[in-house]
């Protein structure tokens, strides 16, 4: 079985809690939540995550801004938790025509693994998360 740390970054409390509970139900070792990009970056520099589920549209700092900040942090040798960045699964309610998948993926091609559109298929998302967890 694969296990690891997962960070769910979603500003909607209900969606964030639902995702956390669903992933915990899949027996993942640790699932944390963050309400916005600022909180997420703080957590990422203090703990190593295998997977980050990242909403695009959030207050304070968007998911795109989080990706840009992660790229900058990865080049900082003093931040050890980012030397092996998490696999990022982006979630968004934006229409594909307004925010194409490749536009998101190009921002951080080493990290963004997949883009999911809301409403989410939770089982599909959980299965995808599991593929990026260490064995």
Enumerate the language-model features and the residues they cover:
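Conserved acidic carboxylate
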Residues: 10
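Two-component/phosphorelay signaling modules centered on CheY-like receiver
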Residues: 13-32
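Acidic catalytic/metal-coordinating carboxylates
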Residues: 36-39, 62-68
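Active-site residues of response regulator receiver
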Residues: 55
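Receiver (REC) domain active-site loop signature in two-component systems and cognate sites
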Residues: 58
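Alpha4 helix (beta4-alpha4-beta5 surface) of REC/receiver domains from two-component response regulators
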Residues: 65, 85-86, 95-115, 123, ...
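Hydrophobic/aromatic residues positioned on beta-strands within the core alpha/beta folds
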Residues: 91-93
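A Lys-centered signature of the CheY-like receiver
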Residues: 118
């Amino acid at each position: 079985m694969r296990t690891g740390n997962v960070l769910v970054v979603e500003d909607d409390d209900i969606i964030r809690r639902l995702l956390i509970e669903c992933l915990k139900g899949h027996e993942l070792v640790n699932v944390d939540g963050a309400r916005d990009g600022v909180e997420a970056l703080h957590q990422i520099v203090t703990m190593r995550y295998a997977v980050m589920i990242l909403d695009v549209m959030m207050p304070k700092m968007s998911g795109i801004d989080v990706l840009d900040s992660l790229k900058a942090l990865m080049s900082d040798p003093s931040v050890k938790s980012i030397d092996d960045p998490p696999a990022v699964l982006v979630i968004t309610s934006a229409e594909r025509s307004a925010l194409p998948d490749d536009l998101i993926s190009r921002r951080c091609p080493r990290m963004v693994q997949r883009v999911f559109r809301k409403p989410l298929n939770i089982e599909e998302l959980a299965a995808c998360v599991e593929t990026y967890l260490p064995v």
